[in-house]
Amino acid sequence: MASRLLLLPRRRSRHGGASLLLARLLSSSSSEAGGGGAVEKVLVANRGEIACRVMRTARRLGIPTVAVYSDADRGALHVRAADEAVRLGPPPARESYLNASAIVDAALRTGAKAIHPGYGFLSESADFAQLCKAEGLTFIGPPPSAIRDMGDKSASKRIMGAAGVPLVPGYHGAEQDIELLKLEANKIGYPVLIKPTHGGGGKGMRIVQRPEDFVDSVLSAQREAAASFGINTLLVEKYITQPRHIEVQIFGDQHGNVIHLYERDCSLQRRHQKIIEEAPAPNVTAQFRSHIGEAAVSAAKAVGYYSAGTVEFIVDTLSGEFYFMEMNTRLQVEHPVTEMIVGQDLVEWQIRIANGECLPLSQEQVPLNGHAFEARIYAENVPRGFLPATGTLHHYRPVPSTATVRVETGVEEGDTVSMHYDPMIAKLVVWGESRNAALVKLKNSLSNFQIAGLPTNVGFLQELAGHSAFEKGLVDTHFIERYQNDLLSTSTQALSGSHEAEELGAILAAACICKKDHVSSEVSLHDKKLSMWYAHPPFRMHHFAKRLMEFELDRELGGSSDDLLKLSVTYRSDGTYFVETEDGSSPGLDVKVDSRGDHDFRVDVGGLQTDVTLAFYSKDNCNHIHIWHGKHHHHYRQTLRAEQSPDDSSQPSASSEARSHPKGSVLAPMAGLVVKVLLKDGARVEEGQPVMVMEAMKMEHVVKAPCAGYVEGLKATAGQQVFDSSVLFTVKENKPN
């Protein structure tokens, strides 16, 4: 049986006291109730932003915290945020954050009587929850039995079916023989979705359109599932071609009470991973909201659930029906959007329920106030298919947090995003009285979220938030695929429209750089402070001084231009700068610059004043210049001479061989681990034939031959780490001798 989605505008519920609730949620002052009971000291068995998030609430409740860390995270923000910290082991997760016995031992050594698992890692491990219980520790989460029942997606489907929760047609059995799975897929009918029975986050999911691709997809999904969750069993379901992903936040206590805190729409995804979530879901009726909430509560009650959980549904936009997909037995990454619309701290609820307290609200008392968005900011290379990226945060300036804007992060400027863990840098969460108001706030906050040093998806998120279909709430899980050309700004019209802003950005950057040099590089000459412009050629101590500058544009969303922007900057005696393009393609501009710090400037162009931020760093034999002006962010490069190249030493760069690779060379698409080498050096290959499999941040990537020929220089072996853009092998037309 399925429930139907009615696509009608939502009547916005308005409740008083929203500002007070949000202020309480974000406050760092101590709670009037305190944190007694079983949870008197908590170890957070996680890292990054979620560890910092849990510690913030614990601190507000007066509860001391213990962090755990790998060698890669020795100086991480979550370690510094805790009262105590314990080393777990080397960087690989299986030797650190997935080492259950080491984590329990850390809790016992430090006297922490409770463990909060966060999300990911061991958060959905029934064995870990059971181990905590056996050692007399409070696991801040659901009972092990519920984790086990719902963690096995095949078992959970059977339980949900018995409870009357609607299910997608599919195979959920224990038998994993590949021929049986193939037979079941044929019965279901293509396209089918292959999904691991354990874990989440899109890891190991494969959409298979044709029977001939099924076996390879199963093998790849099994490898990725094993690497991510330690279990490689799969289920096969009918693939809904035009789905929405809507999930319901539920909460239960140890006294049998279960409520829902409304739904979230998580349809905007790439690689089956969410990147923008919102609450409540747009364009649904109150009747649908009630029905899907009731189904989620029924699902939780069927397994005796307590603590925070999320019941995920797939909604068929063609038929209007929704189906149970899975239940996440933990706090979700996107829980802040729910916190914003109900005005409650869900981590505090988890702690109080672990203490044996009742739910603080009944279903009728849960408010629905306004609208909230969350945008996940990742280190990733968008033009390369959203592959994860690594590097140093040379400049990191999130938007300031307020009562209606939250930034959840686990990094600071100078930190390194490594290949070992998820590449998420931060979560930007905004709230408004309506969806439109919240969306305006999201767009503005994204345009002011400053990161430089490695590729990110901030520009892509801006394109998403500004797309007309998204503004109308017309979302499904194929949104990014459908509007790819719009979002990646690859059309001629889009590139033409951005050129003016890019040129203006270069002009402003040139003027600000000159101002910075003028102010900070003064020398003493005859007891007078004069700019280095006057002390060093080619500038003269005359009425005017001129400087030539070149900028090579690096577009975040691809379509990089090989053309150089050549600018001439003339310093005038009145302190202004006249900047013009060397080719005279556009009229010159008079720019007045006031310095407001190392990175911040106020510029005046023809009477129009605006704030500008610049970031500088050197990497890969280039000076990198980032500028933020208005809603725009641009990245320019300037090539350095060899003696001027203080490359970033914290992150190894590609070798000189990779920078000057011959025709047919295949470069590593990301920094990562070689999982499997499928061919031998010298082997004959066809265009598109898989040669090796790489893995980074738990995501698998198949490296294929770019053309037909013979493999040469294939030296990588399974287990070897390679750097981004390093040469993996070359495909040559003729067989090597």
UniProtKB/Swiss-Prot annotation:
Binding residues annotated for Mn(2+) 2, in chain numbering: 326, 328
Biased composition (Low complexity): 647-657
Superkingdom of the source species: Eukaryota
Binding annotation for ATP: 153, 185-246, 272
Co-factor: note: Binds 2 manganese ions per subunit.
Induction details: Induced during senescence.
ATP-grasp domain span: 157-355
Domain Biotinyl-binding: 656-732
Pfam short name (any one): Biotin_lipoyl
Keywords from the UniProt entry: ATP-binding, Biotin, Ligase, Manganese, Metal-binding, Mitochondrion, Nucleotide-binding, Transit peptide
CDD domains, sorted: biotinyl_domain
GO molecular function: ATP binding; metal ion binding; methylcrotonoyl-CoA carboxylase activity
Enzyme class label: ligase
First and last residues of the transit peptide: 1-33
Modified positions (N6-biotinyllysine) in chain numbering: 698
EC identifiers of the protein: 6.4.1.4
Reaction it catalyzes: 3-methylbut-2-enoyl-CoA + hydrogencarbonate + ATP = 3-methyl-(2E)-glutaconyl-CoA + ADP + phosphate + H(+)
Function: Biotin-attachment subunit of the 3-methylcrotonyl-CoA carboxylase, an enzyme that catalyzes the conversion of 3-methylcrotonyl-CoA to 3-methylglutaconyl-CoA, a critical step for leucine and isovaleric acid catabolism.
PANTHER family per record: CARBOXYLASE:PYRUVATE/ACETYL-COA/PROPIONYL-COA CARBOXYLASE, METHYLCROTONOYL-COA CARBOXYLASE SUBUNIT ALPHA, MITOCHONDRIAL-RELATED
Subunit description: Probably a heterodimer composed of biotin-containing alpha subunits and beta subunits.
Annotated protein name in UniProt: Methylcrotonoyl-CoA carboxylase subunit alpha, mitochondrial
Source species: Oryza sativa subsp. japonica (Rice)
Lineage, broadest ranks: Eukaryota, Viridiplantae, Streptophyta, Embryophyta, Tracheophyta
